[in-house]
């Protein structure tokens, strides 16, 4: 039986380390701080460019000496490095990692350097982020320094309250601002921080002016800029005149801010962020995926942003023991299987994934678990599970605090119509309290429907209920908490998507059934005019597909992937089509916008992500 390479390497290392420990065939002794380390030249040279140059070059006196004294490294660190060279084992902790990195950099053992940088990347926190950035720069680990600086920017609100902020070098602050890393405070607050920093360090006016030149003045309104004049800081007043001379025109400033207001769900600060198209989950040739792909409009390419996480514990307690057992069983599935048919929403530029289902051995398991993704910090956290396990429901954000979940296929101990009606088919999630609350129920229960929010009103249309495809449209006023039935859609429809631009709602995609119960694609985009409570045909879809992902990017409706109805095989598509509501024209850029793989049943959203990650 053949031995794998890894097993052979382990066997070789064990043999070499045994020879070293026994002092057999060793041909060099390293002396560090009075400590003696016996080793084999060839082993050291194979692992270190430093030792390779020392022992392979006959002109080097060390190549002929049996004992070599090393300076600039500690004996403890050298011991760890030699153990790693002979065993591939490296014991790192917060107390010895800097010492080990310094020694590994000195003797050029790349694998140890990499282990140290990975260890420190995982340990970056508010207490050490500046120290790690400074250390990384000293040892030339610029990727690690970038990670630390990006952490500082993503947590700038908290970092600014620490003593490290005032201890940050002027060159470091200038560097991170010039890199345009995303930050978690408004640009106006950044101006105040810089002024405070300048006052504390008693910077010369020229130095502060250089920092202020890096401010994104287009993200500060005229009224906000006036508030700076009331601060008790003379340098602010002096610089404002320079701003008027050097900044872009106020019309451009206002136009940029108006755009942010229209988009509604923008980040705290636009610095270093770009509006991007996200494709979430769905089916590909390899099956159901948890990947979240992102299309960068500046680089015109797709890349993997993140993935819907697996959770390994059930944090919520329930007063229903039987339901606890069911949820724990479903939890064991969520750890190992990708999810589908979940609810998706963007609130305050954070992505929420709630509920969904898993197919295991042709049986569907619905689960209640939820996740929240912050693109600024590239991090996921769990949220409270939804009260009624749901899939194929709508999830929509209202304002800056709430998510509304409506309808869907549900799973509960008593799933009768009467029981579900008593439970309510509508729930609201509060991001402040991390709780779900039942809301007034939608009279017509449904799943595979669509929902969209305009102002403080939630609109629901279509879907399936008791094997009947619906055309009805409803509106929920989140202020009065009342439902109102509106004009029905021109045709019954399910598995479609609603998007809103101005005071018009667009129903995109979906299908309905003929009298013979065969599925027929909806070939048009229908527009609902809110003021007149009427539907009309907006446009014909050039190549309609089943299960396309649909969203809007500014004033354009985008269709991603889907299943072609005209093909019996190879039905899946990677095509991305878009409809401009202002010009009434469709476009398709095959070489850039199309997804890397064929995809269907994915969910699409637009949100701001850091431009530096792509």
Segment roles from a protein language model:
Residues 2-6, 10, 35-39, 46-49, ...:
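Alpha-helical scaffold in the C-terminal half of BTB/POZ domains
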Residues 69-72:
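Conserved AAA+ ATPase "SRH/arginine-finger" region at the nucleotide-binding site
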Residues 205-614:
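Kelch-like beta-propeller repeat domains
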Residues 31-33:
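Short strand-coil-strand connectors
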Residues 20-27, 573:
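A short, compositionally biased
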Residues 50-56:
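Short amphipathic alpha-helical interface patches used for protein-protein assembly/oligomerization
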Residues 15-18, 119:
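Short, intrinsically disordered linker segments that flank or connect zinc-binding domains
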């Amino acid at each position: 039986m053949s031995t794998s390479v890894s097993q052979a390497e382990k066997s070789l290392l064990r043999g070499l380390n045994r020879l070293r420990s026994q002092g057999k065939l060793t041909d060099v002794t390293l002396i560090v701080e009075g400590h003696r380390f016996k080793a084999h030249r060839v082993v050291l040279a194979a692992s270190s460019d430093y030792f390779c140059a020392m022992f392979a070059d006959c002109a080097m006196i060390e190549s002929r000496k049996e004992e070599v004294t090393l300076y600039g490294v500690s004996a403890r660190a050298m011991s760890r490095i030699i153990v790693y060279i002979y065993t591939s084992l490296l014991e790192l902790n917060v107390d010895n990692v800097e010492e080990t990195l310094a020694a590994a950099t000195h003797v050029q053992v790349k694998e140890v350097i990499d282990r140290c940088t990975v260890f420190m990347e995982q340990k970056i926190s508010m207490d050490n982020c500046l120290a790690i950035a400074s250390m990384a720069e000293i040892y030339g680990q610029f990727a690690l320094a970038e990670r630390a600086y990006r952490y500082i920017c993503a947590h700038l609100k908290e970092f600014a309250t620490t003593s490290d902020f005032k201890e940050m070098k002027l060159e470091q602050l200038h560097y991170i601002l010039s890199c345009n890393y995303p930050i978690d405070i408004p640009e106006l607050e950044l101006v105040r921080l810089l002024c405070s920093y300048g006052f504390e360090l008693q910077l010369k006016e020229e130095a502060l002016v250089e920092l202020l030149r890096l401010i994104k003045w287009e993200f500060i309104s005229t009224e906000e800029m006036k508030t700076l004049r009331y601060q008790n800081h003379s340098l602010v007043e002096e610089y404002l005149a320079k701003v008027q001379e050097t900044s872009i025109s106020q019309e451009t400033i206002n136009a940029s801010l108006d755009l942010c207001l229209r988009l509604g769900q923008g980040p705290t600060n636009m610095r270093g962020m770009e509006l991007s198209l996200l494709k979430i989950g769905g089916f590909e040739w390899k099956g159901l995926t948890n990947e979240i792909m992102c299309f960068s409009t500046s680089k015109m390419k797709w890349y993997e942003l993140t993935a819907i996480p697996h959770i390994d514990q059930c944090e919520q307690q329930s007063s229903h023991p039987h339901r606890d057992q069911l949820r724990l069983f479903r939890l064991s599935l969520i750890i190992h299987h990708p999810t589908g048919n979940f609810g998706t929403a963007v609130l305050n530029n954070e992505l929420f994934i709630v509920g969904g289902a898993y197919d295991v051995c042709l049986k569907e398991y619905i689960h209640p678990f939820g996740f929240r993704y912050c693109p600024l910090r590239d991090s996921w956290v769990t949220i409270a599970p939804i009260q009624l396990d749901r899939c194929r429901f709508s999830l929509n954000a209202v304002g800056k605090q709430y998510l509304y979940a409506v309808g869907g296929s549900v799973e509960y101990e008593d799933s009768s119509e009467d029981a579900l009606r008593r439970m309510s088919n509508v729930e609201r999630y509060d991001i402040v309290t991390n709780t779900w609350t039942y809301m007034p129920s939608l009279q017509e229960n449904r799943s595979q429907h669509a929902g969209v929010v305009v102002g403080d009103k939630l609109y629901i249309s279509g879907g399936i209920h008791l094997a009947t495809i619906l055309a009805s449209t409803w509106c929920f006023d989140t202020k009065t908490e009342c439902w109102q039935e509106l004009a029905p859609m021109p045709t019954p429809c399910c598995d479609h998507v609603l998007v809103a631009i101005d005071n018009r709602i667009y129903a995109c995609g979906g299908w309905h059934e003929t009298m013979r119960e065969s599925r027929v694609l909806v070939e048009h985009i229908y527009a609902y005019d809110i003021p007149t409570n009427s539907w009309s045909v907006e446009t014909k879809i050039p190549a309609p597909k089943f299960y396309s992902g649909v969203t809007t990017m500014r004033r354009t409706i985008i269709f991603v992937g889907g299943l072609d109805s005209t093909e019996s095989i190879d039905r899946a598509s990677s095509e991305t089509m878009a409809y401009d509501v202002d010009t009434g024209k469709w476009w398709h850029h095959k070489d850039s916008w199309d997804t890397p793989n064929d995809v269907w049943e994915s969910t699409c959203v637009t949100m701001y992500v850091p431009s530096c990650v792509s």
